[in-house]
């Protein structure tokens, strides 16, 4: 081997950069014409992340450009705002629709596919009124349900409040009897004024007075049997004392006089 035809062996050097966390490797090749080429490869450090098949290429430093979406919202100035719109029909995206179209072409052919499309269009036109009727019925059903639910929600609190008010303002039987018997106002002196009718305040005052009178009568009725029992308990000891006390003895002078006579 001559030095002109000899090829120098490639030398590799490994440099570690602790701050950057990367390792750089340089390969140099020498030719007899003193023409050298240096290739630099940079391998990023793996770090503490797991080496999974999804992020393996990213960890090794190989990156691919992301594919651009099909549709973009373009602003007034012609700049893309980053919003993406993916067209879909009945949950079928654009690539799936392309696959379905290719399969349909292979199965039916161009003429058969055109006939199938025409038949589908006719059937859809025929079913349009039925679909509209179904939509109208569903809307009416929803509206009726919402109305019934709203009415129930409104009536339930009204009924509860009305029942609570009735419970709180139920008059006593004596008050109801008085209202049924007489509907005229009564003066404190006992005179009846037929010209005046009961007002709410007077009605409340009368009911309060009647309640007080009923309570006083009940107290008197309960107190009277207690007093009778107390008197009965007090009387027997007096009779016993009268029975136990002996009659008074006569003096001796009175007892001796009849004997002398």
From Swiss-Prot:
Record-level GO BP terms: protein import into chloroplast thylakoid membrane; protein transport by the Tat complex
Coiled coil residues, start to end: none
Topological domains annotated Stromal: 110-261
Main location: plastid
Domain of life where this protein originates: Eukaryota
Matching InterPro entries: TatA/B/E (IPR003369), TatA/E (IPR006312)
Annotated transit peptide: 1-86
Membrane topology: Single-pass membrane protein
GO terms of molecular function: proton motive force dependent protein transmembrane transporter activity
Keywords tagged on the record: Chloroplast, Membrane, Plastid, Protein transport, Thylakoid, Transit peptide, Translocation, Transmembrane, Transmembrane helix, Transport
Gene3D superfamilies, alphabetized: 1.20.5.3310
GO terms for cellular component: chloroplast thylakoid membrane; TAT protein transport complex
Compartment(s): Plastid, Chloroplast thylakoid membrane
Matching PANTHER family: SEC-INDEPENDENT PROTEIN TRANSLOCASE PROTEIN TATA, CHLOROPLASTIC, SEC-INDEPENDENT PROTEIN TRANSLOCASE PROTEIN TATB, CHLOROPLASTIC
NCBIfam families in alphabetical order: tatAE
Functional note: Part of the twin-arginine translocation (Tat) system that transports large folded proteins containing a characteristic twin-arginine motif in their signal peptide across the thylakoid membrane. Involved in delta pH-dependent protein transport required for chloroplast development, especially thylakoid membrane formation. TATC and TATB mediate precursor recognition, whereas TATA facilitates translocation.
Name by which UniProt lists this protein: Sec-independent protein translocase protein TATB, chloroplastic
Organism whose genome encodes this protein: Pisum sativum
Gene: TATB
